[in-house]
């Protein structure tokens, strides 16, 4: 089952996506897409790893080369997040982003978290506009394939396709 969870900054999307994964009794995998650029990023990653360890997630670092991720046949994976992955694809040679369907075929459930950054109403030029268009294409393509699509607003999930996975 493929579930796409969208939301703005601090909307509760990540917490909601994690709660979906925690409902399953299957092995849990966290596909981490953040690239560590500095000490602040490293501290954030360490904090999140510690939080997930208590919840029995196995972390798979995949800021690039998502196509190389190998997961056991049964399990539930949480990919956090498509915004990072899209940026990595745009700004890194040989970037990832095209291979989410391959990852989905490896596990029983895949929950994807993505950013809702299209409501600002501002026009951007150059790289920012290119990034927003790329992320919109990724979100649209995955929403079309997904069994469930929801947007989290103020911590409340609103489903546009499917419903709460059991």
Name the predicted role of every residue range.
Residues 17, 48, 78, 115, ...:
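Residue-level signal for inorganic ion chemistry
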Residues 46, 50-98, 109:
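Portal/gating segments that form or line small-molecule/metal binding sites
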């Amino acid at each position: 089952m493929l579930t796409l969870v969208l939301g703005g900054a601090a909307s509760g999307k990540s917490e909601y996506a994690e709660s979906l994964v925690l409902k399953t009794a299957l092995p849990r995998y966290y596909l981490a897409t953040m690239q560590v650029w500095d000490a602040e990023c490293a501290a954030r990653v360490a904090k999140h790893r510690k939080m997930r360890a208590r919840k029995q997630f196995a972390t798979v670092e995949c800021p690039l080369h998502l196509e190389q991720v190998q997961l056991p046949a049964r399990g539930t994976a949480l990919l956090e997040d498509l915004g990072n992955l899209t940026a990595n694809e745009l700004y890194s040679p040989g970037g990832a982003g095209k291979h989410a369907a391959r990852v989905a075929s490896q596990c029983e459930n895949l929950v994807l978290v993505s950013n809702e950054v299209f409501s600002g109403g501002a026009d951007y030029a150059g790289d920012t506009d290119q990034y927003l268009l790329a992320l919109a294409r990724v979100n649209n393509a995955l929403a079309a394939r997904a069994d469930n699509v929801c947007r989290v607003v103020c911590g409340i999930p609103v489903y546009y396709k499917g419903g709460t996975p059991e």
